[in-house]
Amino acid sequence: MKFELQHTDNASDARTGVITTDHGQIQTPIFMPVGTCGSVKGVHFRELREQVKAQIILGNTYHLYLRPGLDTLKAAGGLHGFNGWERPILTDSGGFQVFSLTGIRKLKEEGCEFRSHIDGSKHFFTPENVMDTERIIGADIMMAFDECPPGQSDYQYAKKSLGMTQRWLDRCIKRFNETEPLYGYKQSLFPIVQGCTYKDLRREAAKFIADKGADGNAIGGLAVGEPTEVMYEMIEVVNEILPKDKPRYLMGVGTPQNILEAIERGVDMFDCVMPTRNGRNAMLFTYNGTMNMRNKKWEKDFSPIDPDGCETDLVYTKAYLHHLFKAQELLAMQIASIHNLAFYLRLVTDARQHIEQGDFVTWKNSIIDQLGKRI
């Protein structure tokens, strides 16, 4: 993987670049649709390519390990061969899911024992077998296995957790370097900065990771209940230290406003389930604000869903989408998901254009309040 920094904004830390992988290029800043189990919920790959304009999607190691399982994925030639997506893929290590979805778990130095949320079966993740699992899945970008402490952890627990994450990272890197890709294309490993909301721990984590010389670096453990201003402060603290010549990935974030604020602070890559999850619940994001398509006000509004949006937005009307949600038709969730994902990709594409033009901050400030309004 190679990252080329192309433009930097004079008034902020915003920047544009290009990530080159063996499955294609990724223009940054970029939003990555989440395909937890190998698919983006409710959206066909054709629509992801042609309407959403997705350049890279995510898979999740925890979920793919449980279903369809490693034997199937290996026999298929990895996730690319299994699902037919020909562009880049990134896999999360499953750490967040192990520490959030599984109610019964035992954490120790070697790794984490947990029970499947599907059938209660017992499993054990270590840095080594997670690296092996991500090799089998075969994503272009692999995430290190880390401990994900609760967002409001006290300082002593956060410090202890960070120490564990750092030791696990060393083991991840060792295993990654000892193994080879399985399917004839290169893979990259991204470490993850943890440290909760403690500046000194975030700085320590960022310095530890910066010294590793990885192809890119991630910021984890944010957007888990802390105030947004605290999240932005943590991003600033970390990005002062992470190398500028490597892509920076803010995991699990967030709202359109969050993304623009993080771009201003030097973040390049984003993922979040919000566009599809909110879409399935009739909430649409637009430059004018958010729309609840179940509201009666849309009942006789025959204008396009978004006159500046993708093809789906132009084909269907607000009244029709309102009707579909009221009738509980599956098409409603599909249309809303396509719209929201296309909007998120348009947002980061527009941000990229304004960084290149040199007016990113002015543009961001002119739209950010409107983005959060309810229409």
What are these model-derived regions, one by one?
Residues Q152-Y155, K159, G216-L222, L330-M333:
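Glycine- and acidic
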